Amino acid sequence: MLTLLLCLAALAVSASSCTGGKNEADDPTRVRVGIVFDIGGKDDRSFNAAAFEGVKRAERELGIVLRDVEPGNPTSIEPAMRAFAERGYDLVIGVGFAQAPIMEIVAKDYPHINFAIVDGVSQLPNVASLVFKEHQGSYLVGMIAARTTRTGKLGFVGGMDIPLIHRFATGYEEGAKAVNPNISVYRNFVGVTDSAWNNPGKGKELALSQIGKGADVIFTAAGNSGLGAFDAVEQAGKGADGRATHFVIGVDSNQNMVKPGYVLTSMVKRVDNAVYDIVNDVKNKRFQGGIHVFGLDKDGVAFSLDQYNQPLIDPSVLQEVEAARQKIIKGEIQVTDAMAK
């Protein structure tokens, strides 16, 4: 059965979207990288998309051979990883915490293959764990939300109800309450299984429920499900002044352009940079396993500011948030890490 799965995965690897000819994957002179996305897919305009941006940049700038797999369901992840490892790829990347236990199993069987897991942790020497201080970036967007709300009520829509997503929610609430201790923050989660990342209908339903309670700024950390919150704030419409009455805060990648005028900002995780850097390390033969942490100090997390949202945020708010960012970096502000509880 395993042989059959490996064969099927190998076919998926061969047919995956990538550039280059058929024989490039067998070119021993070039670094070969395989990436396995989570079930949200690389076009989720969020977490997976950020990882894809990183490997595509590596393909352009470093001349690697890139293959990717978008598993239709979680059972396809392990065979895909094994297919890359069996072919002797120089680096196998897994996207998302849910892949960490799977990679732990596969990486043990291929100790001479380099692996990297985004948002997961492994103690194996051939696995690089790429993790982020999401709570720090979430604190900053919480401050922006608190300075923007007219109702004193905020919302948070998470994907899967897990400690990682509580890290976003807790940082967001602490940042908001640093501005206004009396502010209300409603929290809801799409679900408790992997499907929670790919249910925009449920995401919209939760966001509309929070809007019904008075929330006028909603932060979403829910993968593809979060796009439903974008639809919800757009549905709420604009006021007489032509300004949106409700805003959403995007996550992972810059989502400001998804619904221009309705996206207050995005809490960006520079997954693209982390993935690019680990590919570059492999190319330059300096790969190191272990935990690689990306926080505000390394620009691993940030909030996005561009032509789409700059008119929505007062310069005085940006100054206040920048001051807080510096204090977090210096350790003068300690943001609670929900995963460390």
Give each language-model segment a name:
Residues 1-5:
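Bacterial N-terminal signal peptides that target proteins for export
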Residues 6-12:
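Core hydrophobic alpha-helical transmembrane segments of single-pass membrane proteins
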Residues 13-17:
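C-terminal motif of bacterial Sec signal peptides marking the signal peptidase cleavage site
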Residues 22-341:
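A residue-level marker of the well-folded mature domains of exported/periplasmic proteins
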